[in-house]
Regions:
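Pocket-lining segment of extracytoplasmic ligand-binding domains
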Residues: 114-116, 189, 205-309, 313
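Bacterial lipoprotein signal-peptidase II cleavage site
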Residues: 33-42
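Short, glycine-/small- and polar/acidic-enriched structural segments
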Residues: 24, 44-203, 211-214, 218-248, ...
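Extended low-complexity acidic/polar segments
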Residues: 2, 16-17, 209-240, 313-318, ...
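Secondary-structure end/capping motifs
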Residues: 262-372
């Protein structure tokens, strides 16, 4: 079940979704329709159809390797083997557009940066559910190789792009900035910037390497393969891997509409089964996964195989270590991978993310975070039963990265 992804333009996407006129920041348009209860019924009407069938799996994705399980499950026919029809995945360029389309029911299974469903559910009342982690790690901070920035300590007075305000990239970057005594700010790029300030701006991942090479920005933090593309195609230098700051952190998660999870439990379980199987296969076959994803293979990602293979595999001290490398790896004892695969949503990570979001500079109204309980988010947003059932079929936690022995872990963060 391979083939080029169906590329949806912004105008086509909004027309399909029935939400023409929304701004790019309009994640929460459904809030104006009456909160979570009304949002649930809207989802049921637009995305779910009848309650007792097995609808086609409709996947939207950003062209990053975070989407690997969704795309490999489609390419390898894992959805079909679960008895589900899967439409050709649709490539979307920006997180705003993808989140809008998911809310509107254009897609019933997608990946989102884990802070986005937190925002959707608790700021906007949209009934999203996180059914699995898509991966761990897989992001980095990239700067110009011929520029003055040699480490994250040199980011003062600089313009750094993030893919989205509600992203692990923004959260981890600001943790790093604070550790160096730098203040993250959000302001116009033309405004004066103090030496101890770093200006953050949102940019779609596909635009980042070009912006770096032309000098429009000083650096970016984003998912792969845009860091590998920056290295190979845009004169970039990786100065820190996010997985070397927060060991095996989640980033993108697989999400469904809450109505589907409750009313279509069999469909939801089958879809998660396919994702977990794809994660295990991808962990054990990274070179082949890179080929399939690349434009030299099934064409899901608009990059040649060598770029995606580098993004998934290259993680050596000679290139990235402190002694003689770029310094992107400072904790080799963690034995991390550039991308790791483990589908279970550890409660400790969810709780720490909520805690960190409360300290992160974000654009827009963040009042919902003030009284948001990390424990409540871990209980309410995550659906654990589906992935636990799937893990039972595919070797348990021991068959995945981290080789965790049970469903609890301690978060390790060392900036």
């Amino acid at each position: 079940m391979t083939g080029s992804p169906h590329k949806v333009t912004r105008r086509q996407l909004l027309r399909l979704a029935g939400v023409s006129g929304l701004g790019l920041t309009g994640l929460g348009y459904l809030a104006g329709c009456g909160g979570a209860e009304d949002a649930t019924s809207t989802t049921a009407a637009t995305a779910s159809g009848s309650k007792d069938d097995l609808p086609p799996v409709r996947i939207g994705y950003i062209p990053i390797t975070d989407a690997t399980p969704l795309l490999i499950a489609h390419a390898q026919g894992y959805f079909a083997e679960e008895g589900l029809e899967a439409e050709q995945p649709a490539l979307i360029r920006s997180w705003s557009a993808l989140a809008e389309a998911f809310q509107a029911g254009t897609f019933n299974l997608t990946h989102l940066l884990i802070p986005i469903p937190i925002y959707l559910r608790y700021a906007r009342g949209f009934p999203v559910k996180v059914v699995a982690w898509n991966h761990m790690n897989n992001s980095a901070l990239t700067v110009r190789d011929d520029g003055p920035i040699r480490s994250s300590a040199d980011l003062g007075g600089r313009q750094i792009a993030v893919p989205y305000w509600y992203s692990m990239h923004n959260v981890i970057l600001q943790m790093v900035l604070r550790s160096h005594g730098l203040q993250p700010v959000i302001q116009d790029q033309k405004a004066a910037l103090a030496a101890d300030q770093t200006n953050l701006l949102v940019m779609s991942p596909p635009d980042m390497p070009t912006a770096l090479s032309t000098g429009a920005i000083d650096g970016y933090i984003v998912a792969e393969p845009f860091n590998a593309a920056g290295e190979l195609l845009a004169g970039g230098r990786i100065v820190r891997f996010t997985g070397d700051v927060w060991q095996n952190h989640p980033c993108c998660v697989a999400v469904m509409h809450g109505d589907d999870v409750t009313a279509r439990r069999a469909w939801s379980q089958k879809a998660v089964n396919a994702l977990v199987r794809a994660e295990r296969w991808s962990r054990e076959n990274k070179e082949e996964a890179a080929r399939i994803l690349s434009k030299d293979g099934a064409g899901y990602l608009p990059f040649p195989e060598n770029v995606i293979a580098r993004a998934m595999i290259k993680y050596d001290l000679e290139t990235y270590g402190v002694d003689g490398g770029t310094g992107a790896i400072r904790h080799p004892e963690w034995r991390s991978s550039r991308i790791a695969f483990e589908p279970y949503q550890f409660r400790s990570a969810t709780k720490r993310i909520v805690q960190e979001l409360k300290q992160t500079v974000l654009e827009g109204d963040t009042s919902f975070l003030k009284d948001l309980s990390p424990e409540h988010v871990a209980d309410d947003l995550m659906v654990y039963g589906l992935v636990k059932t799937s893990l039972g079929q595919w070797g348990g936690l021991a068959a995945f990265d981290g080789a965790y022995k049970d469903y609890e872990r301690t978060e390790v963060i060392e900036v």
